[in-house]
């Protein structure tokens, strides 16, 4: 009996060790995916700010990997761009060399997106067939893969909105594209954090745990609002702070009918709502930090809440600076990257309350 118990214990320890090794491999893979997704969002922001997103007017998922390689191919690509309203109304007179600048931004964005599909799908397949993917992770990882495929279609759906009548993409489709990218990033972060070792600190209160979830979800919503701002160039509506046109609440916020359409199509209203969202997020993380410090000042949860507050303050400062400088490209990209950092940490913070995935220690003992 003692020998059987010892053998079972040794088998259990080996199984736990194998699970931990597999988790380290999965974490390493997801860390690479997260880094690539972060880079993709930054390149996407630069593509938008340089008005490069409509430079490639066709969607070729496979052949589009190869850029123009000869002068003739560049001329042909440029002729395609000259057919769309953006060229006729904004960039008429652009040279081929000028066109190459905006082309490379969009091409790099698409290439990086394709690359992420590869670095997600191939390792997932390998980990799956070698038994390294825990059963509880299979459906979430497949859902992320499917969402990534859908995101490719959404990207082209967004671009196509600016090829016929508009000189820029639809703000609705831009917001959808960015939000889905952030959902994919958040989902990868949630799984990554769930596979990391956690502290044994109990959550300060149930309310703190719920507030961590609210903050994470609202951070994503604030990114959606920011995408609407970007799609309308609403960041140029008012370039003063803290007042807007000399007032806390400026006029002309609801001049369009029906009134709700102003929330999506009136640049002044859109910027005002995005500002309010930033103030509300700052208030939420401040309240959350104070509550955590009062309830359990020495816990990792409290320390994370302090860091989250600091990140939101820095992001707010970046946003204000971007606004006052009238949205220069560098600051605009930094602001978009900062939003993703806040979202990622908010997700990790929330997951810290929930805890790590339990390890499967069930051992089948055969006679």
From Swiss-Prot:
One of its GO terms (cellular component) is plasma membrane. GO terms for biological process: heme A biosynthetic process; respiratory electron transport chain. Pathway: Porphyrin-containing compound metabolism; heme A biosynthesis; heme A from heme O: step 1/1. Disulfide bonds: none annotated. It is an enzyme of class 1 (oxidoreductase). Keywords: Cell membrane, Heme biosynthesis, Iron, Membrane, Metal-binding, Oxidoreductase, Transmembrane, Transmembrane helix. It is found in: Cell membrane. The keyword Cell membrane applies. GO terms for molecular function: metal ion binding; oxidoreductase activity, acting on NAD(P)H, heme protein as acceptor. Its cofactor is heme b. InterPro entries: COX15/CtaA_fam, Di-haem_cyt_TM, HemeA_Synthase_type2. The chain crosses the membrane at residues 26-46, 111-131, 139-159, 174-194, 212-232, 272-292, 305-325, 327-347. It catalyses: Fe(II)-heme o + 2 A + H2O = Fe(II)-heme a + 2 AH2. It holds the Pfam family COX15-CtaA. Heme binds at residues 274, 335. Its EC number is 1.17.99.9. It is a multi-pass membrane protein. Interacts with CtaB. Catalyzes the conversion of heme O to heme A by two successive hydroxylations of the methyl group at C8. The first hydroxylation forms heme I, the second hydroxylation results in an unstable dihydroxymethyl group, which spontaneously dehydrates, resulting in the formyl group of heme A. Belongs to the COX15/CtaA family. Type 2 subfamily. This is Heme A synthase. The gene is ctaA.
């Amino acid at each position: 009996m003692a020998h059987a118990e010892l053998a079972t214990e040794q088998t259990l320890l080996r199984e736990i060790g194998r699970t931990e090794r597999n988790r380290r491999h999965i974490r390493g893979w997801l860390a690479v995916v997260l880094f690539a997704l972060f880079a993709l969002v930054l390149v996407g922001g630069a593509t938008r700010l340089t008005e490069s997103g409509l430079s490639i007017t066709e969607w070729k998922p496979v052949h589009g990997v190869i850029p123009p390689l000869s002068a003739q191919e560049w001329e042909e690509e440029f002729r395609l761009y000259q057919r769309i309203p953006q060229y006729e109304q904004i960039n008429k007179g652009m040279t081929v060399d000028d066109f190459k600048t905006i082309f490379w931004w969009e091409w790099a964005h698409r290439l990086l997106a394709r690359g992420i599909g590869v670095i997600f799908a191939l390792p997932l397949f390998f980990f799956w067939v070698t038994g390294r993917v825990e059963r509880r992770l299979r459906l979430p990882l497949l859902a992320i893969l499917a969402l990534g495929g859908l995101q490719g279609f959404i990207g082209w759906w967004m671009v196509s909105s600016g090829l016929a009548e508009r000189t820029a993409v639809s703000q609705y489709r831009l917001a959808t594209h960015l939000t889905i990218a952030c959902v994919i990033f958040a989902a990868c972060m949630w799984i990554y954090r769930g596979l990391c070792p956690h502290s044994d600190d109990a959550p300060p209160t149930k309310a703190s745990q719920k507030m961590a979830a609210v903050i994470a979800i609202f951070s994503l919503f604030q990114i959606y609002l920011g995408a609407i701002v970007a799609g309308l160039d609403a960041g140029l509506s008012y370039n003063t702070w803290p007042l807007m046109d000399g007032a806390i609440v400026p006029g002309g916020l609801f001049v369009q009918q029906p009134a709700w359409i102003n929330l999506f199509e009136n640049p002044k209203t859109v910027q005002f709502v995005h500002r309010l969202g930033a103030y509300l997020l700052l208030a939420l993380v401040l309240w959350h930090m104070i509550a955590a410090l009062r309830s359990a000042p020495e816990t990792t949860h409290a320390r994370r809440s302090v860091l989250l507050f600091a990140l939101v303050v820095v992001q707010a400062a970046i946003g204000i600076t971007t606004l006052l400088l009238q949205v220069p490209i560098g600051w605009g990209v930094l602001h978009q990257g900062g939003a993703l950092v806040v979202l990622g940490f908010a997700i990790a913070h929330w997951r810290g309350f929930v805890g790590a995935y339990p390890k499967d220690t069930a051992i089948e003992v055969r006679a």
